[in-house]
Amino acid sequence: MRIILLGAPGAGKGTQAQFIMEKYGIPQISTGDMLRAAVKSGSELGKQAKDIMDAGKLVTDELVIALVKERIAQEDCRYGFLLDGFPRTIPQADAMKEAGINVDYVLEFDVPDELIVDRIVGRRVHAPSGRVYHVKFNPPKVEGKDDVTGEELTTRKDDQEETVRKRLVEYHQMTAPLIGYYSKEAEAGNTKYAKVDGTKPVAEVRAALEKILG
């Protein structure tokens, strides 16, 4: 089962990716993790990636595709994989197709922008322990304080409204066109496309995914 998750940052993909991995026994392939691992391993592709990254440039689509191909040939991907953070653009999706990387399911997590802003901007973190709260959906017992230690909660830089809105604009410009792309692929019988209502509670979204994936 080869799956791509689409959806804006904060749409709940991470939570459900965890569930899919456990339920169907497939690994999550994050291009960021993959690049770091390749650089660390010192492989031929890793060296190329390191040179590009050290020069402060973006790794080319060709190189990422080559890394994806190498990664999905590994033993733990024999039953499938879950692609996270890739493809981000239509040229990347085309390159994947040309490289013969086929996908069984494309799942779109649909959540309105304002709700995403609400979800992310309301997050509060206890940095030492990694505990995460939300001012509206999962508030601490005492406002602004960690339940266990009573220490101050903070807001991550990535969770500030300006940053979130910037990431959403980027998503709509670059990644949202993939929704149309994969809808057409599904019409042509090349993959299955499903839209999931990401505004629903976690358990309901999970049940919807089970229904789609079987």
From Swiss-Prot:
It is an enzyme of class 2 (transferase). Pathway: Purine metabolism; AMP biosynthesis via salvage pathway; AMP from ADP: step 1/1. GO terms for molecular function: adenylate kinase activity; ATP binding. InterPro entries: Adenyl_kin_sub, Adenylat/UMP-CMP_kin, Adenylat_kinase_CS, Adenylate_kinase_lid-dom, P-loop_NTPase. Residues 122-159 are annotated as: LID. It holds the Pfam family ADK_lid. AMP binds at residues 31, 36, 57-59, 85-88, 92, 156, 167. Its EC number is 2.7.4.3. Residues 30-59 are annotated as: NMP. It is found in: Cytoplasm. It catalyses: AMP + ATP = 2 ADP. One of its GO terms (biological process) is AMP salvage. CDD domains: ADK. Its main location: cytoplasm. ATP binds at residues 10-15, 123, 132-133, 200. The modification N6-acetyllysine is found at residue 192. One of its GO terms (cellular component) is cytoplasm. Consists of three domains, a large central CORE domain and two small peripheral domains, NMPbind and LID, which undergo movements during catalysis. The LID domain closes over the site of phosphoryl transfer upon ATP binding. Assembling and dissambling the active center during each catalytic cycle provides an effective means to prevent ATP hydrolysis. PANTHER family: NUCLEOTIDE KINASE. Monomer. Catalyzes the reversible transfer of the terminal phosphate group between ATP and AMP. Plays an important role in cellular energy homeostasis and in adenine nucleotide metabolism. Belongs to the adenylate kinase family. This is Adenylate kinase. It comes from Escherichia coli O45:K1 (strain S88 / ExPEC). The lineage of its organism: Bacteria, Pseudomonadati, Pseudomonadota, Gammaproteobacteria, Enterobacterales. The gene is adk.
